[in-house]
From Swiss-Prot:
InterPro entries: Granulin, Granulin_fam, Granulin_sf. Belongs to the granulin family. Pfam families: Granulin. One of its GO terms (cellular component) is extracellular space. Disulfide bonds join C4-C16, C10-C26. This is Granulin-3. Ubiquitous. The keyword Transferase does not apply. Granulins are disulfide bridged.
Length: 57
């Protein structure tokens, strides 16, 4: 289990991400990169594009 904040958890092997509105969500990747839109994320070693819909290396 990964502890995000204030009792919010995500499954092991995932990453906690927080949306701009303060809502936590679980990125399905270990050490994932959270996108600014608060809904998407990328694998470790990749980053989100400006639209937060594509992952770039």
């Amino acid at each position: 289990v990964v502890f995000c904040d204030a009792g919010i958890t995500c499954p092991s092997g995932t990453t906690c991400c927080r949306s701009p509105f303060g809502v936590w969500y679980c990125c399905p990747f270990l050490m994932g990169q959270c996108c600014r839109d608060g809904r998407h994320c990328c694998r470790h070693g990749y980053h989100c594009d400006s639209t937060s819909t594509l992952c770039l290396r």
